[in-house]
Swiss-Prot record:
Its EC number is 2.1.1.33. GO terms for cellular component: tRNA methyltransferase complex. The active site is at residue 118. Substrate binds at residues 122, 154, 191-194. Catalyzes the formation of N(7)-methylguanine at position 46 (m7G46) in tRNA. It holds the Pfam family Methyltransf_4. This is tRNA (guanine-N(7)-)-methyltransferase. NCBIfam families: PRK00121.2-2, tRNA (guanosine(46)-N7)-methyltransferase TrmB. Signal peptide: none annotated. It comes from Bacillus thuringiensis (strain Al Hakam). The keyword tRNA processing applies. It catalyses: guanosine(46) in tRNA + S-adenosyl-L-methionine = N(7)-methylguanosine(46) in tRNA + S-adenosyl-L-homocysteine. S-adenosyl-L-methionine binds at residues 44, 69, 96, 118.
């Protein structure tokens, strides 16, 4: 995806620092204070233009959401949604998710969403996939005991790789769909990419995976 440069982006982000948290590492362990309540916290890694996080936060005011996106020219679009209609249970982070364990304390997050992540199809780029074992380890570090990952993609190769990676890591697959939009799954909230790809007839894959609280026998 080619990103269009937006020279105003950083100024906009700095102006609305109560929406886009500038130094998330300083908030580690204190995110409930940021939100001002004790509600569970769900994060999306690679939140893009923010439609999924925004719609989730609007539909579930009893849950706090944090969207993480490293590209400034993209996260500013998510910010614009918040400027237009503020949601008290949604914050954004404009940083690389590789630093996830610096942003959050151990057990501070209840769920991780991965939606239409870059498939990085070349073998030499395997370690960049957001379901590679080092990322799975980072998610486990910040999640509560028995925390979950919810993953969606239209890329069959990435989906198959992710199932294998999660299984090898010892995770328990609690929900699996090979064709989400033709399944009985209720309450699906689409991303921008999901709407685009499904309208072209692409099959959408979805899995929910849970970290085990006890070692595998």
């Amino acid at each position: 995806m080619r990103l269009r440069h937006k020279p105003y982006a950083m100024d906009r982000i700095n102006e609305y620092s109560h929406f886009v948290i500038g130094n998330p590492e300083e908030r580690a362990g204190n995110w409930k204070e940021v939100f001002g309540n004790e509600q569970p916290i769900h994060i999306e890694v690679g939140t893009g233009r923010g439609r999924f996080m925004y719609d989730m936060a609007k539909a579930n005011p009893h849950i706090n959401y944090i969207g993480i996106e490293k590209f400034t020219s993209v996260v500013v679009d998510a910010l614009d949604k918040l400027i237009e209609e503020e949601l008290p249970n949604l914050k954004l982070i404009n940083k690389d998710a590789e630093d996830l364990t610096v942003f959050f304390a151990k057990g501070e997050i209840d769920r991780v969403y991965l939606n239409f992540s870059d498939p990085w199809p070349k073998k030499r780029h395997t370690k960049r996939r957001l379901t590679y074992k080092t990322f799975l380890r980072n998610y486990e570090e910040v999640l509560v005991e028995g925390g979950e990952i919810h993953f969606k993609t239209d890329n069959q190769g990435l989906f198959e790789y992710s199932l294998m990676s999660m299984a090898e890591y010892g995770m328990l697959l609690t929900y699996l769909s090979l064709d989400l939009h033709n399944s009985d799954f209720e309450g699906n909230i689409m991303t921008e990419y999901e709407e685009k790809f499904s309208s072209k007839g692409h099959r959408i894959y979805r899995v929910e995976a849970k970290y085990r609280t006890e070692p595998m026998q």
